[in-house]
Amino acid sequence: MLGLIGKHLTIDMYGCIFKTLDDVDFVKETMLAAVKEGNMTLLNFTCHKFEPQGLTILALLAEGHMSVHTYPTMSYTAVDIFTIGEQSSPNQSIRVLKQSFKPEKIKTTNIKRGDVGSLSDMKPKIKLSTTPMRRVRDTSAKVFKFLSRSR
């Protein structure tokens, strides 16, 4: 039976700051900071800017890869981090990305790669988090909807 080969994290960031998502230099710097903070070794780096908006940036790492795809019109960013070994800290990379893109809501899915003998691998762990202001807005909308039905 094979043991765990690597960690694969997919991160969906909703409600990101619009202007940052189409700024090539900002996203590059953010991604390089995330690679460094996650104790990963950069081998190669490539970027493509789409017209009229959006970016795809890929980092080939000694430990795996990291990709960032931005969708400015949707205020959405999709991130993919795959690492092998125990020396890297992909969760630290996520912290850097969250601080830079400032999403209102984030969904992180953790997948254990190569853990063939584990049934728990069949169900990835999913973590949701929402900013406090988003919770206030959502609650306010629910209260308003409830009160408007009462009449």
At which residue positions do the language-model features occur?
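Polybasic/polar functional segments that serve as interface/processing modules
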Residues: 1-67, 71-151
